[in-house]
C-alpha cells in the first residue's frame, strides 16, 4: 500500500506567490464593477457616522511617495472604521487653483497668458487641472484606496466655489475681512503676495553690512557728528530707509574710535568692537534709548534724514541695537513707523525692480542692486564693513525663488480679532502626536493677520465691488448674489462680465450716486480655497458632518491646511472643523536623506506597484512610525516583502489544512475543544484586543508587529508546526483534528479581517478560498471584537508557563542537532526534569508532550545528571531506540506490531486499518 495516499496532506489552490502586480489591477477592476464602495455604505447605513476629511492634494503631476503614505494611512482608518461599527464614507478631494497650474501652461505648454483674455486663460487652467485629476485619481486607485472616486470634491467646481464665497461673506459680515496697506511676503518670481503658509526657508548667500548714519540735530543729548551704526543683510532696502529704531529701555553708548564717534547698544559693545576691528575704543557717554527719540540722522546717500524711533522689536540678539527701519519692507518697521506718522514707502515694483522713487537704481532688480548700493556706501564713507554670510531666508515654495517684504494694498483676514477663540479651540482637539497641539498653538499665537489676496489669474475672485469713491462694497446681498452666480455659472463669470452685470438687479449704494461700480481683480489665496472645505464638503455633502472626526496630513500642514481650515471654521462657526488631527512625517531614503533626482534615491509609487505590488507598499506604511519622518529604499521594501511572505504563507497553510473542513458541520463546540486549541484561540483574542486598541489610537505599526509576531511565533513556530502530526496523520474526523481545524478557522477568519484594512487585495484573495465565507467580500464584514474563551485563568497561566518549558526544550534540541546527537527532532527521545514545583505541576498536567515538542517521546523525570540546563527545566536529548514509522516518521517501539502493516507504528496501523482498509 502507498501510505502517502492515506495522509490528509494540505490542499489549496491559494498560490504561494502573490503575483501582486498582475493580480491587484484585476481585483481593483472587480471592486469597481461590483461597486464595493457603495455596498460598504449600504451595509453600514444607520451606524454612527465617522468622517475622515481628505486634505486635497494639488492637481499637478504624478503622485509621489509622500502622497502614497498619506492616502494609504487614510485608507487604513476608513476601512477599519467601516469594519468596526461605523458608517465611514470617504470623499477624496483636489486643490486646483494657483500658480503651479499657471506656470505649467505658460512654461510647459508655451501659452502666452498676457496676450490672452483672462477668462480664456482660466478655461485652459481648468482643463489642465481636470486632466491632472484624472491622472492622479487612477494612481490613487491603484494603491487600493477605496472611496467615492466618481464624486470627489474639487475646489474649482461651481458648488464648491459658491460655498467658499459664503465663507468669505460670513467672515466679512463679522468684520474679519479688511483691505490694508502693509508689508507682506512678496514673490517677484510669482508677481504676487504670499501667505506665511506659502513660504519655505532655504539657505541664501547675502551681503552683511555695517552702515553709519550721521546725527543731524542731536537735541540736547548729542553734540552732533556722532554716527548710529546699523547692520543689515538687505542693502537693497536702504533706498527705502526712513528711520532708525532703538529700544526705549536699552542702554546705548557713544564710542570714540579714532576720530569717529559711534552709537551702539552697550550690550553689543564687545561683539561690534570685535566685528569692526576697533582698536582702543573709548566709551564717552551712555543714555537710554528713550532719550534719543526724535533725533534725526542723515541718510547715507539721499538728501533726507532718518528719524530715531522706539520699537519693542529691537533686541540685542545680533547687530548693533540700532535697527535700520524701512516701513515699506518690514512688518515691524511698518508698525513702528506708522506710530510716528510715517507712511510705508516702497520703491520696488511687483517684479522686484526699483522704480523712479529710488534715484540712481531705477530699473535694477533688487538683488542686483546690492552691489551698487554697497559701492555707493563705500564711496561716501558710510560703509564700515562688508562680508558675506549664508543664512536661512524665505523663499516662494512654488518657484523656489527668494521673496521680499513689500508694502502693497492687500486683503486680509483679521486673525487678531478671533485669535483667542482659535487658541481655545485648539485645546479641544485631540492631537496625534501630542506635540501637534503646541506647534499649531504657537503658530496661531504668533501669526499676524492673514494676507488672502493674490495678484494672479487662476483662482476664486475676491467678491468685492468698489463704489465711485473707491469704498469697498461687501454686503449680504452682494455676497449671496455672487455665490449663486458662481453656483450656476462658475467663477469665470467674474472675468466675463462687467461689475454692473455681477451685482443684484437694481443694486444701489451711497458710495456710487451715479450707479457706477468697479470690481476687485485679485483672487483668493489657495489656502482660503482648501481651508473652506469644511463648508463645501463637511456641511454640504451627504453623509458628512462638521466637525469631521479626523484630518490627517503631513506635518507641513500645521502652517497650511490645518491652520487655514481652523481659522475659517472658527471665524464662521466658532468651532474647529475637526475633532482630531493626525500628522505624518516626510519620506526619506534608506540613509535618512531627502529624496531627489540628483541623488538618484527617489522611490516612485507606480514603480513599486509594478515590481512588488501595492500591498507591499501598504504593508510598509503599516510598519513605520509614520508620525516621525520615515525611511524607504529597495532594501527596506525587500524586508517588507519578506514579512509579507510570512503572513501570506501563514494564510496559505491555514487554508490548506481547512480543505476538508466545513464550519457548519465540522466545527467543535468550544467547551469540547482541546485545551491547546482553546489556548491558541485565547491568544488570538489578545492579538485582537491589542490591535483594536492600536487601530483606534491610529497606531498601525504595533498592529503590523502583533500580526506578524503572531504568525511567526505563535502560529508558524508552534500551532501550525506541532499540529501537522495530527492534521496529516489522524483520521479525517478525529476529535483532535477537528478541534485544531476549529481553532484554525477562527484564527484564519479573524486574522484576515484584522489585516484587511492594511493589505486589502491579499485579504480579499484569502477570503475567496475560505470555506463557507459569511459574505461575498472580507471588506463587507466586521472585524470581531476580543471575546472570552472557554478557558480559565489558571489554564492560561499553565500554558504560558509551558511556553517557557518549550523554549528550554527547543534550545536543548538545537544544541543536540549541532552536536550531531540527532538529525531531525523526530529522531529524539527527551527526558525533562523540572527545576521547581510550579514547573513540575505544569508538566504533570500536560498530555501529548512529544507532539508539542515534535519529538518521538518525552519523559518526565525527577532529576537529570547529564542534561542541558534551561531556565525552568533541564533536558536530556538522546536518539529514540525505536524504528521510524513509514507513515508519520515518528520513531516508535510499536513499529512492526501490526503484521498487515509491519512498517507502521500502532497509531498509524490503526488509522489505516479502520479508514483505508479497501
From Swiss-Prot:
It comes from the Bacteria. It is an enzyme of class 6 (ligase). It is found in: Cytoplasm. Binds 1 zinc ion per subunit. GO terms for cellular component: cytosol. A motif ('KMSKS' region) lies at residues 594-598. PROSITE patterns: AA_TRNA_LIGASE_I. Its cofactor is Zn(2+). It catalyses: tRNA(Ile) + L-isoleucine + ATP = L-isoleucyl-tRNA(Ile) + AMP + diphosphate. Its EC number is 6.1.1.5. Pfam families: Anticodon_1, tRNA-synt_1, zf-FPG_IleRS. A motif ('HIGH' region) lies at residues 57-67. L-isoleucyl-5'-AMP binds at residue 553. InterPro entries: aa-tRNA-synth_I_CS (IPR001412), aa-tRNA-synth_Ia (IPR002300), Anticodon_Ile_BEm (IPR033708), Ile-tRNA-ligase (IPR002301), Ile-tRNA-ligase_type1 (IPR023585), Ile-tRNA_ligase (IPR050081), M/V/L/I-tRNA-synth_anticd-bd (IPR013155), Rossmann-like_a/b/a_fold (IPR014729). One of its GO terms (molecular function) is tRNA binding. Its main location: cytoplasm. Keywords: Aminoacyl-tRNA synthetase, ATP-binding, Cytoplasm, Ligase, Metal-binding, Nucleotide-binding, Protein biosynthesis, Zinc. Gene3D superfamilies: 1.10.730.20, HUPs, Ile-tRNA synthetase CP2 domain-like, Valyl/Leucyl/Isoleucyl-tRNA synthetase, editing domain. GO terms for biological process: isoleucyl-tRNA aminoacylation. Monomer. Belongs to the class-I aminoacyl-tRNA synthetase family. IleS type 1 subfamily. IleRS has two distinct active sites: one for aminoacylation and one for editing. The misactivated valine is translocated from the active site to the editing site, which sterically excludes the correctly activated isoleucine. The single editing site contains two valyl binding pockets, one specific for each substrate (Val-AMP or Val-tRNA(Ile)). Catalyzes the attachment of isoleucine to tRNA(Ile). As IleRS can inadvertently accommodate and process structurally similar amino acids such as valine, to avoid such errors it has two additional distinct tRNA(Ile)-dependent editing activities. One activity is designated as 'pretransfer' editing and involves the hydrolysis of activated Val-AMP. The other activity is designated 'posttransfer' editing and involves deacylation of mischarged Val-tRNA(Ile). This is Isoleucine--tRNA ligase 1. The lineage of its organism: Bacteria, Bacillati, Bacillota, Bacilli, Bacillales.
Amino acid at each position: 500500500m502507498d501510505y502517502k495516499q492515506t495522509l490528509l496532506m494540505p490542499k489549496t489552490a491559494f498560490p504561494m506567490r502573490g503575483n501582486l502586480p498582475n493580480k491587484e489591477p484585476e481585483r481593483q477592476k472587480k471592486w469597481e464593477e461590483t461597486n464595493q464602495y457603495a455596498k460598504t455604505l449600504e451595509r453600514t447605513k444607520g451606524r454612527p457616522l465617522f468622517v475622515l476629511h481628505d486634505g486635497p492634494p494639488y492637481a499637478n503631476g504624478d503622485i509621489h511617495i509622500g502622497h502614497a503614505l498619506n492616502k494609504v494611512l487614510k485608507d487604513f482608518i476608513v476601512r477599519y472604521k467601516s469594519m468596526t461599527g461605523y458608517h465611514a464614507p470617504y470623499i477624496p478631494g483636489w486643490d486646483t487653483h494657483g500658480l503651479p497650474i499657471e506656470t505649467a501652461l505658460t512654461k510647459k505648454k508655451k501659452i502666452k497668458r498676457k496676450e490672452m483674455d483672462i477668462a480664456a486663460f482660466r478655461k485652459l487652467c481648468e482643463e489642465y487641472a481636470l486632466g491632472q485629476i484624472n491622472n492622479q485619481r487612477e494612481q490613487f486607485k491603484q494603491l487600493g484606496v477605496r472611496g467615492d472616486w466618481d464624486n470627489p470634491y474639487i475646489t474649482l467646481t461651481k458648488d464648491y466655489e459658491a460655498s467658499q464665497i459664503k465663507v468669505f461673506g460670513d467672515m466679512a459680515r463679522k468684520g474679519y475681512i479688511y483691505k490694508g496697506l502693509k508689508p507682506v511676503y512678496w514673490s517677484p518670481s510669482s508677481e504676487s503676495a504670499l501667505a506665511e503658509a506659502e513660504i519655505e526657508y532655504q539657505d541664501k548667500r547675502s551681503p552683511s553690512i555695517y552702515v553709519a548714519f550721521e546725527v543731524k540735530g542731536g537735541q540736547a543729548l548729542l553734540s552732533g557728528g556722532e554716527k548710529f551704526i546699523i547692520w543689515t543683510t538687505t542693502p537693497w532696502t536702504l533706498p527705502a530707509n526712513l528711520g532708525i529704531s532703538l529700544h526705549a529701555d536699552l542702554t546705548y553708548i557713544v564710542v570714540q574710535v579714532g576720530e569717529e564717534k559711534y552709537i551702539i547698544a552697550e550690550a553689543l559693545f564687545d561683539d561690534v568692537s570685535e566685528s569692526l576691528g576697533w582698536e582702543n575704543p573709548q566709551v564717552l557717554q551712555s543714555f537710554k534709548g528713550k532719550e534719543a527719540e526724535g533725533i534725526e540722522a542723515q541718510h547715507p546717500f539721499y538728501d533726507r534724514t532718518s528719524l530715531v524711533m522706539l520699537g519693542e522689536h529691537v533686541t540685542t540678539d545680533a547687530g548693533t541695537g540700532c535697527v535700520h527701519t524701512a516701513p515699506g519692507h518690514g512688518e515691524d518697521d511698518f508698525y513702528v513707523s506708522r506710530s510716528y506718522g510715517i507712511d510705508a514707502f516702497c520703491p520696488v515694483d511687483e517684479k522686484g525692480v526699483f522704480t523712479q522713487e529710488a534715484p540712481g537704481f531705477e530699473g535694477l532688480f533688487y538683488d542686483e542692486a546690492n552691489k551698487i548700493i554697497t559701492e555707493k556706501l563705500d564711496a561716501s564713507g558710510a560703509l564700515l564693513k562688508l562680508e558675506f554670510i549664508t543664512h536661512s531666508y524665505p523663499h516662494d515654495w512654488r518657484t523656489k525663488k527668494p521673496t521680499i517684504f513689500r508694502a502693497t494694498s492687500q486683503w486680509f483676514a483679521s486673525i487678531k480679532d478671533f485669535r483667542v477663540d482659535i487658541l481655545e479651540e485648539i485645546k479641544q482637539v485631540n492631537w496625534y502626536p501630542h506635540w501637534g497641539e503646541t506647534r499649531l498653538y504657537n503658530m496661531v499665537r504668533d501669526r499676524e493677520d492673514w494676507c488672502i489676496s493674490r495678484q494672479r489669474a487662476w483662482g476664486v475672485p475676491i467678491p468685492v465691488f468698489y463704489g465711485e469713491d473707491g469704498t469697498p462694497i461687501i454686503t449680504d446681498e452682494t455676497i449671496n448674489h455672487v455665490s449663486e452666480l458662481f453656483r450656476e455659472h462658475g467663477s469665470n463669470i467674474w472675468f466675463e462680465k462687467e461689475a454692473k452685470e455681477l451685482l443684484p438687479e437694481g443694486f444701489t449704494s451711497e458710495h456710487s450716486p451715479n450707479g457706477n461700480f468697479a470690481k476687485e481683480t485679485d483672487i483668493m489665496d489657495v489656502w482660503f480655497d482648501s481651508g473652506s472645505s469644511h463648508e463645501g464638503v463637511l456641511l454640504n455633502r451627504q453623509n458628512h458632518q462638521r466637525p469631521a472626526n479626523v484630518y490627517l496630513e503631513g506635518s507641513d500642514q500645521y502652517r497650511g491646511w490645518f491652520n487655514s481650515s481652523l481659522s475659517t471654521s472658527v471665524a464662521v462657526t466658532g468651532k474647529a472643523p475637526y475633532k482630531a488631527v493626525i500628522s505624518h512625517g516626510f519620506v526619506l531614503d534608506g540613509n535618512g536623506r531627502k529624496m531627489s533626482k540628483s541623488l538618484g534615491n527617489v522611490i516612485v509609487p507606480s514603480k513599486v506597484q509594478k515590481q512588488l505590488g501595492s500591498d507591499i507598499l501598504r504593508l510598509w506604511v503599516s510598519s513605520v512610525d509614520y508620525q516621525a519622518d520615515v525611511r524607504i529604499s529597495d532594501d527596506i521594501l525587500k524586508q517588507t516583502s519578506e514579512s509579507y511572505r510570512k503572513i501570506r504563507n501563514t494564510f496559505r497553510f491555514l487554508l490548506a489544512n481547512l480543505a476538508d473542513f466545513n464550519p457548519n458541520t465540522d466545527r467543535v463546540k468550544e467547551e469540547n475543544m482541546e485545551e491547546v486549541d482553546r489556548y491558541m484561540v485565547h491568544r488570538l483574542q489578545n492579538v485582537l484586543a491589542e490591535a483594536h486598541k492600536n487601530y483606534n489610537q491610529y497606531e498601525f505599526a504595533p498592529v503590523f508587529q502583533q500580526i506578524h509576531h503572531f504568525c511567526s511565533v505563535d502560529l508558524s513556530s508552534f500551532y501550525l508546526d506541532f499540529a501537522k502530526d495530527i492534521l496529516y496523520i489522524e483520521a479525517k474526523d478525529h476529535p483532535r483534528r477537528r478541534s485544531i481545524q476549529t481553532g484554525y478557522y477562527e484564527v484564519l477568519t479573524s486574522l484576515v479581517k484584522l489585516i484587511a484594512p492594511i493589505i486589502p487585495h491579499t485579504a480579499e484573495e484569502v477570503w475567496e478560498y475560505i470555506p463557507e465565507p459569511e459574505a461575498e467580500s472580507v471588506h463587507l464584514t466586521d472585524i470581531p471584537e476580543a471575546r472570552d474563551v472557554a478557558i480559565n485563568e489558571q489554564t492560561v497561566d499553565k500554558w504560558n508557563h509551558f511556553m517557557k518549558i518549550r523554549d528550554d526544550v527547543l534550545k536543548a534540541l538545537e544544541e543536540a542537532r549541532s552536536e550531531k546527537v540527532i538529525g531531525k527532532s523526530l529522531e529524539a527521545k527527551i527526558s525533562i526534569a523540572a527545576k521547581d514545583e510550579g514547573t513540575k505541576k505544569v508538566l504533570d498536567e500536560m498530555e501529548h508532550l512529544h507532539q508539542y515538542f515534535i519529538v518521538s517521546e518525552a519523559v518526565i523525570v525527577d532529576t537529570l545528571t547529564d542534561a542541558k540546563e534551561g531556565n525552568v527545566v533541564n533536558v536530556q536529548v538522546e536518539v529514540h531506540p525505536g524504528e521510524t514509522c513509514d507513515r508519520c516518521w515518528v520513531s516508535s517501539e510499536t513499529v512492526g506490531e501490526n503484521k498487515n502493516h509491519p512498517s507502521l507504528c500502532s497509531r498509524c496501523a490503526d488509522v489505516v486499518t479502520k479508514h483505508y482498509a479497501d
